[in-house]
Amino acid sequence: MQEALVKARDQIILNPDDLPGSWYNVLADLPGEFPRPKDPEDGPSRLEYLSRVLLKHCLQQEVSTERWIPIPSPVQDLYRQAGRPRPLYRARRLERFLGTPAKLYYKREDLSPTGSHKVNTALAQAYYAAEEGCAGVSTETGAGQWGTALAYAASLQGLKCIIFWVRSVYDWKPDRRALMQLYGGKVFASPSRETSVGRGILEKNPDHVGSLGIAVSEGLEYAEKNPGYAYCLGSVLNHVLIHQSIIGLETMKQFDMIDEKPDVMIGCLGGGSNFGGFILPFAGEVVKGKRECRFLAAQSASAPNLSKGEYKYDFGDHAEKTPLLKMYTLGH
C-alpha cells in the first residue's frame, strides 16, 4: 500500500478528460506591448509576403491578445491519440545522487510519437492546413525533431510534407531521415537544388554544410512557388508558443493534484517553444502576483544568443525573406 502511494505521488498522471480545452496566450497578461515585426526600409514588403505563405489561422493567433484560445475538438482528439496528457515524474534517484533536499520533477514530453514536444504545434498546424484546403506543407528542420513531427502530423491529415534539413545533420542522422520518410515526408539536404536560394549557395560552394537560416529560406520559397502549399514553423513565433502552452497547463494541473507549487522551473532553450510552453502559464501568474517562481533557461554554448547576442531587429532567415523581428541575435 505504501509503495502504491509513493508511486502515485511520483507519477502524476492526468486523465484524458483532464486535457486542457484551451491554449494560453501570455501576451494577454504581459505589461506593455512587444516590439512588432516590421518591414525593412527598402525592398518588397516582408509582412505582406508572410501573409501569403503562412496559414491564416496561425497568422490570426500570431497577433491575438486573447488570453484563452480554444483548442479545436479534432486537435484535442489528436492530442489524446498522441498520448496527451503527458505524465509528470518525480526524480527521486536524481535527488539522492545530488544529495539535495529539493523535490525534483520532470515533464515527459519525450513520450510523444516522434520523441519531442514539437508534435504539440505540428498537430495544430497540420489540422489548420487541412481546414484551409492546402495540399501540403513545407518547412525546415535543424536537429530533425520538427521535421519528423510535421511529417507525422501531415500524414494524419493526408497532406504532403516537404522538409529542408540542414545538410550537416541530414548526413549525420540517416535513421531520423528514415523516420520522416516513413511518415511520408520528402526530405532534402539544405542547401538543395529545389530552390533558387539553395542553388545560388551551391554554385558558390558545392560542399556547403548548410544552416537553419538557409533551410528556413528554402522552406519559405517552396511554399511561395508551389500553389497549395503553406509554410509551417516549429518554434520562435507567438502562435507556436500558444500551442506549446499545453505543456505548462498540464503541468500546473499536475502540481495542483499533489498540492505542490514549483519555486524553480528549468528548461532547455533553442528557439524557445519548449521552454516557453513549459513556463509561460506559470509566468503569467507570476506577472499577476498570483505565484512566486523563478525560471531558468539552459542554452547551448554553441549558439548563445541570450548571453552573447544583441537585442535588435534582424531577419529570421538567410535570404531575408522574413520581416525584421526584434530578438537576441548573433546574426542571420
Placement of each model-derived feature along the sequence:
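Short coil/turn connectors at secondary-structure junctions
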Residues: 100-102, 133-135, 157-161, 182-185, ...
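Active-site/ligand-binding loops adjacent to catalytic centers
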Residues: 71, 85, 201-239, 247, ...
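General beta-strand structural signal in soluble alpha/beta enzymes
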Residues: 104-108, 138-139, 188-190, 231-235, ...
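A glycine-rich, Thr/Ser-enriched phosphate-binding loop motif common to dinucleotide/cofactor-binding enzymes
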Residues: 113-124, 235-250
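Positively charged, low-complexity intrinsically disordered leader regions
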Residues: 2-134
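A short, small-residue-rich loop immediately preceding and capping a beta-strand
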Residues: 121, 129-168, 261-275, 295-296
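Active-site-proximal loop->helix
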Residues: 146-209, 306-318
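Phosphate/pyrophosphate-binding loops at sites that engage ATP/ADP/AMP, CoA/4′-phosphopantetheine
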Residues: 253-260
